[in-house]
Amino acid sequence: MLIDTDVIIWYMRGNEKARDYLDSNPRFRISVITYMELVQGMRNKQELSALRRALRNWKAEIIYINEEISSKAMFYVEQHYLSHSVHLADALIAATAVSYGLPLLTGNEKHYKIIKDVDVQKFEPK
């Protein structure tokens, strides 16, 4: 399972459903894009340390961008940006899921609905 940025944000904010899911399904994967988005949202070094600790405890694997992911993401942006405003980060995360054959757990289904290749698993924080 590839975990989208929003699910980890919910976890860091103390959301019970996110906590239950991530704590009971360790060894998931995240895109390096997700990691960078999370780091950009940190307000201080303590939050960054908490994120790193959580990822270590979960034994989460960070998937780095390669040529296949880049190529798929470029295709998604070319095909869907003008009509549906597919953003670069979402295209890269979707391409990572597709390239690795992983379902994508996200609460932001609307970000990925136009990309038919992605197996989106809906996360409901409430």
PLM feature spans:
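Short, well-structured N-terminal submotif of metal-dependent ribonuclease cores
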Residues: 1-30, 40-53, 126
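Acidic, PIN/NYN-like endoribonuclease modules and their adjacent C-terminal/linker elements
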Residues: 99-126
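Short, structured coil segments at secondary-structure junctions
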Residues: 24, 58, 115-116
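Nucleotide phosphate-binding site architecture
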Residues: 8-9, 36-39, 113, 121
